[in-house]
Amino acid sequence: MKLILNADDFGLTETVNHGIVECFKAGVVKSTTIMMNQPGTQHAIELYHQGLVPEVGLHFTVTAGKPLSAPELVPSLVDDQGNFLDKAALFNKVDVVEGEVVLELNAQYQAAINADLKINHIDSHHFGGVFKPLKAAFTRSANTIGLPVRRIDNIVNGQDSLLVPTPNAFDMRFFDDGVSLSNLQDILLSYQTAMPNGTVELMCHPSLSVDEELKSLSGYSDKRVEEHQLLTSPELKQWLADHQIECIGFDDLK
C-alpha cells in the first residue's frame, strides 16, 4: 500500500512551517499544501525555494484571513470588514456565488504560480472544497487547472464530476484525539487489508512549537506539536517499513 501524509497549513506561521520541514526531513511526510493568505506564507515560499520542501500543493482557503481577490468581487464570501466568513457561517450559507469561489481559487493558485511554486495538487482548508456551498466551484476549478486533488466525497457523497486524479481513499481520523501511534497504525492496517495495492491519503498538521501567533490563528494548536513528535519518530518510520507501507507524495500519484 502507498501512503500520502499531507501536511496541511504550510504558511500558517513560521513555527508550523519549521515543523513541516522537519517532517519532510524525517522521511514520512512527502507532501504539503500552502495557504497563500497567512502570516507565514512568505516564509513558506522561502523555505520551498531553499529546497527544504520538495513538493507543494495549494491549500485553498476561504475560511481564514482575507481573500486575495478584492473583497467587493467576492461579497458572498466575506464579512463587513472584508475578512472571510468563519467556517460555520460559510458552510451554512445558501447564497454562496459559485463564480466568486472560482475567482478566489484562481487568485490563490495564480499567486502561488507567481511565487514560482510548482503546485502539484489542490486541497482545501477546513474541507471547504467538500462542503455543498463550495463543492461545485472547487470541482469546476480543479477540472480546469487539471491537477490532482484530495478526495471530495468524504463529507458530501460523490465526486463523479471530478476529472482529475485522486488517491483511492482519504481519512481524516489522524487529528485531535486521534493523534497517537496506535490509532495511526489501526487506520493504516484497516486500509492495507481493504486495498493492499491502493493509495490512501491522511492529513496531518505538525508544528515545531506553539506560540501566541498560532493560538490566535487556530483553535488546533497543542496537538500540532504531538503530531510533529510522532511524524518525526524513528518508531513510526520503522513500523511503516516493516509493514511495507510506502510513503509517497502527489508527484508519485499515477
Task: Report each predicted region and the residues it spans.
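Terminal accessory/targeting
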Residues: 1-4, 14-54, 66-95, 99-103, ...
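DG-centered beta-turn motif at the end of beta-strands
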Residues: 7-10
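N-terminal low-complexity, intrinsically disordered segments
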Residues: 56-61
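Gly/Ser/Thr-rich loops at beta-strand to alpha-helix junctions
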Residues: 126-130
